[in-house]
């Protein structure tokens, strides 16, 4: 997984997925919850939301004696500058033992997960996102220039959402 997540590395395609990306138009002095930052990283930040949608047929789901299936995935988002220096990172591991009904739903709807990661508001950065199937040791990853990610308007606190 480490080599697959390096800035500029070829995109591994053992797990095919889509990533819906949205950047907050507002800035924040705080990292997104769970983010780790290098000492070089300074606020303000723009928060990005990453919504993963992966093909379930690419995920290893061994059946257990009790009829459940184990799914163990690591969702990783890394922010690099153009020289490849790592600024912020977010990694979330999901390890579940799913009953047959849940697996049926999983197969119909796909693998879905959402993360937030902070990106320094000024400068040229690249977001590399990936999924690691920890049971099958398969990886999928893509890299996106942060400047190409659309911003979403913030909801006004005084205006109700429509």
What are these regions (language model features)?
Residues 1-162:
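Scaffold/interface architecture of coatomer-like assemblies
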């Amino acid at each position: 997984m480490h080599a697959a997540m390096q800035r500029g590395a070829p995109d591994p395609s053992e797990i095919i997925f889509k990533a819906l990306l949205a950047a907050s138009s507002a800035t924040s002095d705080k990292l997104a919850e769970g983010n780790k930052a290098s000492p070089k990283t300074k606020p303000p930040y723009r928060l990005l939301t990453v919504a993963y949608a992966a093909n379930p047929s690419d995920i290893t789901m061994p059946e257990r004696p009790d009829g459940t299936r184990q799914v163990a995935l690591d969702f990783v988002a890394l922010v690099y500058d153009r020289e490849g220096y790592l600024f912020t990172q977010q990694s979330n591991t999901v390890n579940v033992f799913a009953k047959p009904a849940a697996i049926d739903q999983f197969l119909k709807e796909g693998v879905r997960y959402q993360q937030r990661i902070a990106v320094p508001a000024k400068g040229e950065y690249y977001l590399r996102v990936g999924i690691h199937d920890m049971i099958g040791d398969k990886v999928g990853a893509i890299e996106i220039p942060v400047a190409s990610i659309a911003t979403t308007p913030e909801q006004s606190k005084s205006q109700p959402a429509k």
